[in-house]
């Protein structure tokens, strides 16, 4: 038997990188021109039970609602209408409940999403960026998480990029031992 067939590869994605990558890939579905955020809910058996990204509510045309960040009238911005990735991941769950699960998310959740996360029974939030750390919304979210016993931590990736190469499936493995 050759060495190739006896040794697993070393550069595979470990679970945390995989789940955060799924959150980031999901974010690519967002039509928001300024913020693409994804979330991935995982149970204790490392099974994905929910995925979501930021977007307009089901049945509401994203061609008719505004995507701008600022306007004189708040109703002319995206903020009263858009559903955050965390909400969509919880609503899109493929399991009876998400109690005890972990959520991987690109951005630290706002206070409204923190309330949903707590009510859903999610026990851990792993986030990539906390760029709004000093905002009232994320300050309130951190307080809510602490009071409810939801742990949160910043994700430190092993790789700065994960490339999806659709052509790689067509290449043949090398027959030379390494």
From Swiss-Prot:
<dbReference type="GO" id="GO:0006231">
    <property type="term" value="P:dTMP biosynthetic process"/>
</dbReference>
<comment type="function">
    <text>Catalyzes the deamination of dCMP to dUMP, providing the nucleoside monophosphate substrate for the thymidylate synthase/TYMS. Also, part of a nucleotide salvage pathway that eliminates epigenetically modified 5-hydroxymethyl-dCMP (hmdCMP) in a two-step process entailing deamination to cytotoxic 5-hydroxymethyl-dUMP (hmdUMP), followed by its hydrolysis into 5-hydroxymethyluracil (hmU) and 2-deoxy-D-ribose 5-phosphate (deoxyribosephosphate). Catalyzes the first step in that pathway, the deamination of 5-hydroxymethyl-dCMP (hmdCMP).</text>
</comment>
<comment type="subunit">
    <text>Homohexamer.</text>
</comment>
<keyword id="KW-0597">Phosphoprotein</keyword>
<dbReference type="GO" id="GO:0009972">
    <property type="term" value="P:cytidine deamination"/>
</dbReference>
<dbReference type="GO" id="GO:0008270">
    <property type="term" value="F:zinc ion binding"/>
</dbReference>
<dbReference type="InterPro" id="IPR016473">
    <property type="entry name" value="dCMP_deaminase"/>
</dbReference>
<keyword id="KW-0862">Zinc</keyword>
<keyword id="KW-0021">Allosteric enzyme</keyword>
<dbReference type="InterPro" id="IPR035105">
    <property type="entry name" value="Deoxycytidylate_deaminase_dom"/>
</dbReference>
<feature type="binding site">
    <location>
        <position position="84"/>
    </location>
    <ligand>
        <name>Zn(2+)</name>
    </ligand>
</feature>
<dbReference type="GO" id="GO:0043174">
    <property type="term" value="P:nucleoside salvage"/>
</dbReference>
<dbReference type="GO" id="GO:0042802">
    <property type="term" value="F:identical protein binding"/>
</dbReference>
<dbReference type="GO" id="GO:0006226">
    <property type="term" value="P:dUMP biosynthetic process"/>
</dbReference>
<feature type="modified residue" description="Phosphoserine">
    <location>
        <position position="174"/>
    </location>
</feature>
<dbReference type="InterPro" id="IPR015517">
    <property type="entry name" value="dCMP_deaminase-rel"/>
</dbReference>
<feature type="active site" description="Proton donor">
    <location>
        <position position="86"/>
    </location>
</feature>
<feature type="domain" description="CMP/dCMP-type deaminase">
    <location>
        <begin position="14"/>
        <end position="145"/>
    </location>
</feature>
<keyword id="KW-0378">Hydrolase</keyword>
<dbReference type="GO" id="GO:0070694">
    <property type="term" value="F:5-hydroxymethyl-dUMP N-hydrolase activity"/>
</dbReference>
<dbReference type="GO" id="GO:0004132">
    <property type="term" value="F:dCMP deaminase activity"/>
</dbReference>
<keyword id="KW-0545">Nucleotide biosynthesis</keyword>
<dbReference type="GO" id="GO:0005737">
    <property type="term" value="C:cytoplasm"/>
</dbReference>
<comment type="similarity">
    <text>Belongs to the cytidine and deoxycytidylate deaminase family.</text>
</comment>
<feature type="binding site">
    <location>
        <position position="113"/>
    </location>
    <ligand>
        <name>Zn(2+)</name>
    </ligand>
</feature>
<keyword id="KW-0479">Metal-binding</keyword>
<protein>
    <recommendedName>
        <fullName>Deoxycytidylate deaminase</fullName>
        <ecNumber>3.5.4.12</ecNumber>
    </recommendedName>
</protein>
<dbReference type="InterPro" id="IPR002125">
    <property type="entry name" value="CMP_dCMP_dom"/>
</dbReference>
<feature type="binding site">
    <location>
        <position position="110"/>
    </location>
    <ligand>
        <name>Zn(2+)</name>
    </ligand>
</feature>
<dbReference type="InterPro" id="IPR016193">
    <property type="entry name" value="Cytidine_deaminase-like"/>
</dbReference>
<dbReference type="InterPro" id="IPR016192">
    <property type="entry name" value="APOBEC/CMP_deaminase_Zn-bd"/>
</dbReference>
<dbReference type="Pfam" id="PF00383">
    <property type="entry name" value="dCMP_cyt_deam_1"/>
</dbReference>
């Amino acid at each position: 038997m050759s060495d190739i067939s006896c040794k697993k590869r070393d550069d595979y994605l470990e679970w945390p990188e995989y789940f955060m990558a799924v959150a980031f890939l999901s974010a690519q579905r967002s039509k928001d021109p300024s913020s693409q955020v994804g979330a991935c809910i995982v149970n204790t058996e490392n099974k994905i039970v929910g995925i979501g990204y930021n977007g307009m509510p089901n049945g509401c045309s994203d061609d008719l609602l505004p995507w701008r960040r600022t306007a004189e009238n708040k109703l002319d911005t995206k903020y009263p209408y858009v559903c955050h990735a965390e909400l969509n991941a919880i609503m899109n769950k493929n399991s009876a409940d998400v109690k005890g699960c972990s959520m991987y998310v690109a951005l630290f959740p706002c206070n409204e999403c923190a309330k949903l996360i707590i009510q859903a029974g999610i026990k851990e939030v792993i986030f990539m960026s906390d760029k709004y750390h000093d905002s009232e919304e994320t300050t309130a979210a951190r307080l809510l998480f602490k009071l409810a016993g939801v742990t949160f931590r910043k994700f430190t990736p092993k790789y700065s990029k994960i490339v999806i190469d659709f052509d790689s499936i067509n290449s043949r493995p090398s027959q030379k031992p390494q």
